[in-house]
């Protein structure tokens, strides 16, 4: 772990600031976690930090499609935090059952360690948001999860099938995984369905 510089700032709670800096420096590692999907231009794989930023932006852009009662500020914060656990747990490919089977355990252990780097009040707050996102029971969490599921679909369509083609994914597999989108946003769910239909016509799915 990278430790903060050994300097002292006057008029600041040094222990608290050190904990915050330690967390901030640790999350720099998110930039080196590569996801399976490519950038929309197909030039290289996306990393987790880019993914998290793009989803936070999407929450603002698509705010009008959020369910009633959703708090977009909370959704944005959720999306900034949601993949921090992958610093320890790594990226889990959505169409790899063997990876999925251990995902929850790996990510909970990562959340225990990483969020605990923060001062206690911030640790409780960030962990509660992450748990809420994972549980998907609130309008905020459902909308956040919908955006998280839509983004790789867009990347795959714009890279001529992307991971769908590379890993031999079927239409049925994609349709099952993206049901979550409609749960969080009727409009985005409708768009996702139309995108699947078009991707199918273009031959982006395995027939196996």
Model region roles, listed by residue range:
Residues 1-208:
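Alpha-helical, largely C-terminal catalytic domains
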